[in-house]
């Protein structure tokens, strides 16, 4: 059912009309004429005034004309502007059943990743031949050297991610790769609606998104990754655990509606 849209009393503003246009488009996903926007968004201005704003917004690259009828569609620039203003990224309590169904209903690929809480507990020297890094949940071994032992002892108490990052920065690449494999195998990842990734099959980011590795280098928030796709990351509480949520989909997916639907508090 189409949601009635209210955009406030100051409807003569160009930004308000553009917001109303994008909100309406997200619900119907088809070109919008001035008459239809007035009806669906409940605008208290004339169709002629709306058409004038259509022309201005088209010149600014926010809208483009779909066909000779005068109906318009939002551009990438309009979506980018709208989502940057509309989305929030505070911690969200997530309902598991709603997350699964909403991912499919809204056409989004979603991934939940529980951050690894393991820390380097100790470094064990074995007869000057091996060094064993003990993270409690798992361990790894590498060849002994006095320099490496000293280096690792200074990292006791650090998280797996920190140890891996520091190892890579000091060119200890063998250790960094070993920790990456161990961390990945011990990370809890849950995926929903894999079909939501089909548009990214040829993207160089495909496997990093599928495996959740992209979360390591992206801050929470909004990221435009392809001409018609975007990625959203935010912290969530899922089954009483703090996790990271990754959402990927087309620009015209209703991300606001998705987050409202999966919220435990709704």
UniProtKB/Swiss-Prot annotation:
NCBIfam families: PRK03911.1
Entry function: Negative regulator of class I heat shock genes (grpE-dnaK-dnaJ and groELS operons). Prevents heat-shock induction of these operons.
Keyword Transcription regulation attached: yes
A GO MF term: DNA binding
Protein name: Heat-inducible transcription repressor HrcA
Residue pairs linked by disulfide bridges in the UniProt entry: none
Alphabetical UniProt keywords: Repressor, Stress response, Transcription, Transcription regulation
Domain of life where this protein originates: Bacteria
Biological processes annotated in GO: negative regulation of DNA-templated transcription
Record HAMAP family: HrcA (MF_00081)
Protein family (similarity comment): Belongs to the HrcA family.
InterPro entries: HrcA, WH-like_DNA-bd_sf, WH_DNA-bd_sf
Organism (species): Helicobacter pylori (strain ATCC 700392 / 26695)
Entry annotated with the keyword Transcription regulation: yes
